[in-house]
């Protein structure tokens, strides 16, 4: 899915819709294959934050790409340090979310941080350790549009409308 996202964000940049960067995971190389100039063994330096950060029409965004093969997403796949980073990002005025691929269904969803926070809190209070496909809002279904394989800007716009309505209430 990350290749599809990378392709989409390259097109967003080409069309001046967004500037989004893939954040590399910090590693320490241990073994190198000099003949092929490849790292063959490495360790993670520290916990990474999210997969992508950028700006869309003046709005800072950060998000992670996740995939699951069943109709439920185990929250253990979303680490506490990632949730903390997304929360702090939102407190600074940004928008945080994940793009979740249900590979068995061939569908992708934009899941806003506030919904992730609800599911995470439910888990911490002794509830389910996952959330189901049918708990997600259909308005946040991410569909391909022409060459935009993971066209999430429409879902982001829906999220912005929801946030604006929440702020007015």
Q: Each predicted region: which residue ranges?
A:
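Mg2+/Mn2+-dependent nuclease catalytic core
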Residues: 66-92
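Short, basic, glycine/proline-bearing loop/turn elements
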Residues: 32-38, 64-72
């Amino acid at each position: 899915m990350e290749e599809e996202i990378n392709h989409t964000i390259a097109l967003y940049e080409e069309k001046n819709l967004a500037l989004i960067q893939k954040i590399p995971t910090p590693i320490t190389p241990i073994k190198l294959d000099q003949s092929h100039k490849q790292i063959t063994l490495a360790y993670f330096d520290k916990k990474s934050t999210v997969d992508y950060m950028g700006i869309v029409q003046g709005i800072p965004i950060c998000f992670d790409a996740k995939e699951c093969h069943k109709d439920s997403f185990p929250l253990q796949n979303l680490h506490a340090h990632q949730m903390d980073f997304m929360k702090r990002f939102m407190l600074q005025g940004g928008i945080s979310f994940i793009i979740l691929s249900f590979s068995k269904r061939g569908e992708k969803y934009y899941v806003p941080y506030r919904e992730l926070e609800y599911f995470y809190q439910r888990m911490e209070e002794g509830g389910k350790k996952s959330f189901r496909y049918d708990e997600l809002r259909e308005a946040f279904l991410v569909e391909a549009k022409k060459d935009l394989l993971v066209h999430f800007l429409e879902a982001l716009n829906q999220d912005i409308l929801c946030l604006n309505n929440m702020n007015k209430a």
